């Protein structure tokens, strides 16, 4: 079947992974990828010709009624559907054309963490195998060793101003997708309004919001898009002193360093594996309980 474009459907953290996929599918496979709001199908009941589309539904639990309905209707509109979930008993996989398991084991935390990194790995493997680069499996096997044996500094919580609850997390390319997930965790766990922005979009207007009592997290990845973020640092330093660089450069002032695997896509997994333990410590340092985020439940039902 000739696939000419990809549609992703997801919510929350899974949608951040879907955004990530849009970059790597377009970059490596030349396939335009669009994140479809589930309500377009479930509430608006819009019709599409999906005969040349691959529809990828990402859901940790696979239980949200809107995502189950989106998969069913997408198939009826001619799509080949792929389900990425962590639940092998999910009703969403019964009729889908393909099922890709996250293999994250049970995730008890309310805020999704390891299912995000596992979803990234599934997406990365899918892309590289489509390119005929099956040796990506060997590179992935080395990841756990890199993460576990990382002797670099553990991110400290005391370098971040806990009294400032607003700011931006700025990235570009896959870094922007990761910025969306990082932003979500600041909101879910820390009750901080850290908004994600592309570094290019910030320059088009939102930088006007920046003042000295404003946090700026700058996420630099080892790819062409990430380099542009690093180039913006000097200008942004004119607007606030609260700048925190997340980088593979061990000399960054803010000490938010993560080691590089030399494959930018896999660097994403290393970075998030470093971020998640830190955000737990940071949340605790603020006097909040990361296992009991306010108003949230493990499975969110929407339609």
Regions found by a protein language model. Give the residues of each.
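Glycine-rich phosphate-binding loops that contact phosphosugars or nucleotide phosphates
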Residues: 2-146, 152-153, 172, 207, ...
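Conserved phosphate/anionic-ligand binding catalytic regions in large, soluble enzymes, centered on
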Residues: 20-21, 181, 185-188, 272-277
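Short, flexible hinge/linker loops that cap or flank conserved catalytic cores
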Residues: 48-49, 160-161, 210
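Active-site-proximal catalytic alpha-helix in oxidoreductases
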Residues: 117, 121-124, 177-180, 271-276
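A short, charged, Gly/Pro-tolerant segment at domain boundaries
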Residues: 141, 286, 290-303
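Acidic catalytic cores of enzymes that act on phosphate-bearing nucleotides/polynucleotides
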Residues: 163-232, 239-242
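Structured C-terminal subdomain patch of bacterial secreted/periplasmic proteins
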Residues: 252-289
């Amino acid at each position: 079947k000739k696939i000419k474009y990809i549609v992703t459907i997801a919510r929350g953290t899974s949608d951040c992974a879907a955004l990530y996929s849009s970059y790597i599918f377009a970059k490596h496979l030349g396939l335009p990828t669009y994140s479809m709001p589930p309500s377009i199908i479930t509430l608006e009941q819009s019709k599409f010709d999906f005969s040349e589309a691959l529809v990828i539904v990402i859901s940790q639990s696979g239980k949200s009624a809107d995502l189950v309905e989106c998969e069913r209707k997408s198939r009826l509109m001619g799509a080949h559907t792929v389900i990425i979930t962590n639940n092998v008993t999910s009703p969403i996989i019964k009729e889908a054309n393909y099922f890709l398991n996250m293999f994250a084991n049970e995730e008890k935390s309310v805020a999704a963490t390891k299912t995000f990194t596992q979803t990234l790995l599934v997406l990365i493997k899918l892309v590289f195998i489509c390119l005929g680069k099956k040796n990506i499996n060997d590179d992935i096997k080395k990841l756990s060793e890199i993460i576990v044996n990382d002797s670099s500094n553990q991110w400290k919580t005391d370098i971040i101003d806990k009294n400032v609850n607003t700011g931006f997390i700025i990235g570009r390319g896959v870094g922007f997708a990761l910025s969306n997930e990082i932003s979500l965790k600041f909101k879910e766990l820390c009750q901080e309004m850290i908004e994600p922005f592309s570094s290019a979009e910030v320059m088009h207007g939102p930088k006007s919001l920046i003042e000295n009592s404003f946090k700026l997290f700058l996420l630099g990845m080892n790819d062409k898009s990430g380099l542009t973020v690093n180039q913006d640092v000097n200008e942004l330093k004119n607007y606030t002193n609260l700048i925190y660089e997340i980088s593979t450069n061990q000399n960054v002032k803010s000490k938010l360093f993560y080691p590089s695997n030399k494959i930018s896509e896999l660097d994403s997994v290393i970075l998030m594996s470093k971020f998640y333990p830190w955000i737990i410590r940071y949340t605790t340092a603020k006097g909040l309980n990361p296992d009991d985020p306010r108003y949230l439940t493990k499975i969110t039902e929407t339609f």
